[in-house]
Swiss-Prot record:
InterPro entries: DNA_mismatch_repair_CS, DNA_mismatch_repair_MutL, DNA_mismatch_S5_2-like, HATPase_C_sf, MutL/Mlh/PMS, MutL/Mlh/Pms-like, MutL_C, MutL_C_dimsub
GO molecular function: ATP binding; ATP hydrolysis activity; ATP-dependent DNA damage sensor activity; mismatched DNA binding
Name used for this protein in its record: DNA mismatch repair protein MutL
Stated family: Belongs to the DNA mismatch repair MutL/HexB family.
PANTHER family: DNA MISMATCH REPAIR PROTEIN MLH, PMS, MUTL, DNA MISMATCH REPAIR PROTEIN MLH1
Ranges where the record places region Disordered: 382-447
Entry GO CC: mismatch repair complex
Sequence ranges of Polar residues compositional bias: 427-436
Keyword annotations: DNA damage, DNA repair
Reported function: This protein is involved in the repair of mismatches in DNA. It is required for dam-dependent methyl-directed DNA mismatch repair. May act as a 'molecular matchmaker', a protein that promotes the formation of a stable complex between two or more DNA-binding proteins in an ATP-dependent manner without itself being part of a final effector complex.
One record GO biological process: mismatch repair
Length: 664
């Protein structure tokens, strides 16, 4: 067969297969064109569920006579002209396919009058004849698009249309989404001559709440929490409901990116995760959320219906949404505190340590496997019987004696497993009825790994440490010697002028963290949290935070008191940035309260730094030579001439004289 260029009519009908799925698709494209034209009033008339008639009238800028025929041509648009325009797109439409595709499967009349014309003009075309017929007509400033007999020339497509009631329900739901995205636009919907919906323009908060109540119901308004947050060019605002406003189906989930309706799986995953600890498996969150960001940071041209986008900084967007919602839910009085960092429940191996002084920027690239995993992820929320937790690695026993404090390990493993068990009903059994009900298998290990790759934030890495070397010393004091080899995977053999010595890397790790937390020379710099962490505590713990507020501030831990039983964590030092603050801060306040009566210790920040170092430092099963060199190099730089060489659990001399004697 020879290769030929497709006729324009056939090409448009093929394109219509993607653009025009059902009458609601036509309404979506035409209403979005009205919004792009600056309309503040849109009237929609539907007959027979849209199969007989779809008429959209607006008061937008209109189309001049000379461009009416061109507007019905394929790939003709006023929205973009260059690639730069596409990369900075803010309009809802930009492909120039909608009108041509719709006219190829219907009888379409386009009537318009811009403010610069005294006469309105009408363009008519239908599927079999792509010729456009122009004629003068009467029309106010704005545009009217009339679509008659949808799919009249494609019987196979028309046969797949549902009942009139079903098709109109899709149109009604679509207009609800549009009404929530543009509170400043009046929208009227009629079906078979009867007014069904009338959304009046909202110009203040009270009117906006009325529209919310009209679309989402009074129950949503009673249980809603207002969200408004901005960080690093990202802005999130809108409303979410407390768990009391949870639904039995996902019918009140509306999300918008730069004003565009979205069903993006990355966004949905962040929202699901923020509600994970507060909703039952059969419950669904309800929300109306708006995400705004630089259009250069998002690609909207990745989905035929524009329902999904790709974020250039997907990790940042995901964590921003998750922490914003989790913090808002934690601050509400109706639920317990959600666990912000579940990865802290399990021991995890430490990643490779970068060279000292290296501060690599966090990569925002999301591997393709992540998107594949998200595509195959089970529907929200996690169903009973589905296992999604990564298997924990058993923590190592501490090498520290009981006299030196608590073990360097995560909080009690059994308690955390019990907590996770209580949040995952029937996690060990999955009945056949459940499989039939949900119809989706649990994610595979590869999918879970891909999720972890997207969401995992490693425990505090050494490359993010803010070191405070003494300004009086030009270079670190080399007292630990030259590294030779790692012995028994956890000890480093070094050589000095005095001979050989063995260094415990686990103990060195403790002193490294202690050096980072030691604020004797200068107060530690506090790093503000992306979203302040709200904690509900006992009165005694809040009192301890107030009593030792200056002491905590010197360590870079900043609190803001809410009331006698609640406070907010505003900032922490770099070594604590990636810790599970939801667990660590209450324990720290308990420690401070217990030491209050010991006057000398209460005034000594070193004791608190030692306690924190024991909690934060991690014990590894084995170290590489490069990791060992990194640890002792930072140790020497942090401690300078004050290296704790007197600690026998840190360093001990090794005498090879007897061994050498046997060889001679």
């Amino acid at each position: 067969m020879t290769i030929r260029i497709l006729p324009a009519r056939l090409a448009n009908q093929i394109a219509a297969g993607e653009v025009v799925e059902r009458p609601a698709s036509v309404v979506k494209e035409l209403v979005e064109n009205s919004l792009d034209s600056g309309a503040t009033k849109i009237d929609i008339d539907i007959e027979k569920g849209g199969a007989k008639l779809i008429r959209i009238r607006d008061n937008g800028s209109g189309i001049v006579k000379d461009e009416l025929g061109l507007a019905l041509s394929r790939h003709a648009t006023s929205k973009i002209h260059t690639l730069d325009d596409l990369e900075a797109i803010m309009s809802l439409g930009f492909r120039g396919e909608a009108l041509a595709s719709i006219s190829s499967v219907s009888r379409l009349t386009l009537t318009s009058r811009p403010a610069t014309q005294e006469q309105a003009w009408s363009a008519y075309t239908e599927g079999r004849d792509m010729q456009v017929k122009l004629q003068p007509t009467a029309h106010p400033i704005g545009t009217t698009v009339e679509v008659v007999d949808l799919f009249f020339n494609t019987p196979a497509r028309r046969k797949f249309l549902r009942t009139e009631k079903t098709e109109f329900a899709h149109i009604d739901e679509l207009l609800k989404r549009i009404a929530l995205s543009r509170f400043d636009v009046s929208i009227t919907l009629r079906h078979n001559g009867k007014v069904i919906r009338q959304y009046r323009a909202a110009h203040n908060d009270l009117q906006a709440e009325k529209r919310l109540a009209t679309v989402c119901g009074q129950a949503f308004v009673r249980c809603m929490l207002k969200i408004e947050l901005e960080h690093q060019g990202l802005k999130l605002h809108g409303w979410i409901t407390t768990p009391e406003g949870a639904r039995q189906q996902s019918d009140l989930q509306y999300c918008y990116v730069n004003g565009r309706m979205m069903r993006d799986k990355l966004i949905n995953h962040a929202i699901r995760q923020s509600y994970e600890t507060s909703l039952k498996p059969e419950q669904f969150a309800a929300y109306v959320l708006f995400i705004e960001l630089d259009p250069h940071q998002v690609d909207v041209n990745v989905h035929p219906a524009k329902h999904e986008v790709r974020f250039h900084q997907a990790r940042l967007v995901h964590d921003f949404i998750y922490q914003a919602l989790a913090s808002a839910l934690a601050q509400s009085d109706s639920i317990e505190q959600p666990q912000i960092n579940e990865s802290a429940f399990h021991y995890q191996a430490e990643p490779e340590v970068a060279p000292l002084g290296s501060f690599p920027a966090e990569s925002n690239e999301v591997p393709q496997a992540v998107y594949h995993a998200i595509e195959k992820a089970p529907a929200y929320p996690r169903k009973a019987g589905q296992e999604q937790q990564l298997q924990p690695v058993a923590p190592l026993e501490s090498s520290f004696s009981s006299e030196q404090g608590r073990e360097v390990a995560p909080a009690p493993h059994n308690e955390r497993n019990a907590w996770m068990e209580s949040r995952s009903p029937a996690r060990h059994t999955t009945s056949s009825n459940q499989s039939e009900r949900y119809g989706e298998p649990a994610p595979s290990k590869q999918q879970v790994k891909a999720y972890a790759e997207l969401l995992h934030t490693p425990d505090f890495p050494s490359q993010n440490v803010e070191c405070h070397p003494s300004p009086s010393i030009a270079s670190p004091v080399q007292e630990l010697g030259k590294a030779v080899s790692v012995v028994a995977q956890r000890y480093l053999l070094t050589t000095t002028k005095a001979g050989c010595q063995l260094i415990s890397l686990a103990r060195a790790e403790f002193y490294r963290i202690l050096g980072q937390l030691n604020g004797d020379k200068a107060p530690l710099k506090s790093q503000p949290l992306l979203v302040p962490l709200s904690l509900k505590l006992e009165k005694g713990l809040v009192h301890a935070a107030q009593e030792h507020q200056d002491r905590f501030a010197r360590m870079g831990i900043l609190f803001k008191m809410r009331n006698e039983k609640a406070l907010m964590v505003m900032g922490v030092p770099a070594p604590l940035r990636q810790q599970n603050l939801q667990l660590l801060i209450p324990d720290l306040l308990s420690y401070a309260a217990s030491q209050a009566q010991k006057e000398e210790q209460a005034k000594n920040d070193t004791a608190m730094a030692q306690w924190l170092a024991l909690r934060v430092a991690k014990v590894k099963s084995h170290y590489t030579l490069s990791e060992a060199i990194q640890i002792i190099s930072e140790l020497e730089q942090l401690w300078q001439e004050k290296l704790p060489l007197q600690d026998a659990q840190l360093v001990t001399s090794v005498d090879f004289s007897a061994t050498i004697a046997q060889l001679t």
